[in-house]
């Protein structure tokens, strides 16, 4: 995998608060190599390590995108939801930003069935078929459609398991991360000072609570994916 320059600078990360960790009582000792200091009762992340792993992650996604691979971005907590959706749409990635339904990947056949139901209902709505049904039936199907849109809207074009999964918060999305590990799907994960750095394939030590921090990390990864996709299009 070729190493590239991704314009990751420490000043930008400081401004975004990427270095702020959790309170010193809420930490995972495995994060010690990624922590540079304690300040006013909170751990401070070593941004040199953050830059290194973010750069590695950008190399990985660029390489995968340049080969036409598919990505899934997962981040369901309120702070991250909108950022996840906009980043994914920008880079034409699949995303889950409301709730991770257990077994979404490990029980893919069930997910496929739900997706087919979702596509069928969307098609019926577009053609106006729902409006020709009795009022009660139409209302029930519209509720179903709304629920499916909420939970599966970001993966409606997914036709198989993703090649790489990007996870915004390890603790919040632990079920999704475990499913990827079980299936051997490579993962990139933001990890705060209370996380385990040994679960994901590439763990990026960063503040997973601040919107500015999440936005910065996602923007770098998405830019790398977009560059990789451009390379893929040029060569095919």
UniProtKB/Swiss-Prot annotation:
> What's the main place this protein lives?
plastid
Query: Which InterPro entries does this chain map to?
Result: Ribosomal_uS2, Ribosomal_uS2_bac/mit/plastid, Ribosomal_uS2_CS, Ribosomal_uS2_flav_dom_sf
Q: Which UniProt keywords apply?
A: Chloroplast, Plastid, Ribonucleoprotein, Ribosomal protein
Record-linked PROSITE patterns: RIBOSOMAL_S2_1 (PS00962), RIBOSOMAL_S2_2 (PS00963)
Q: Where's it found, cell-wise?
A: Plastid, Chloroplast
Which GO molecular function entries does the Swiss-Prot or TrEMBL record give? Answer: structural constituent of ribosome
Q: Name one GO cellular component term.
A: chloroplast
| A Gene Ontology BP annotation from the UniProt entry | translation
Instruction: Tell me which family the UniProt entry assigns to this protein.
Output: Belongs to the universal ribosomal protein uS2 family.
Name the PANTHER family for this protein: 30S RIBOSOMAL PROTEIN S2 PROKARYOTIC AND ORGANELLAR, SMALL RIBOSOMAL SUBUNIT PROTEIN US2M
Its protein name is: Small ribosomal subunit protein uS2c
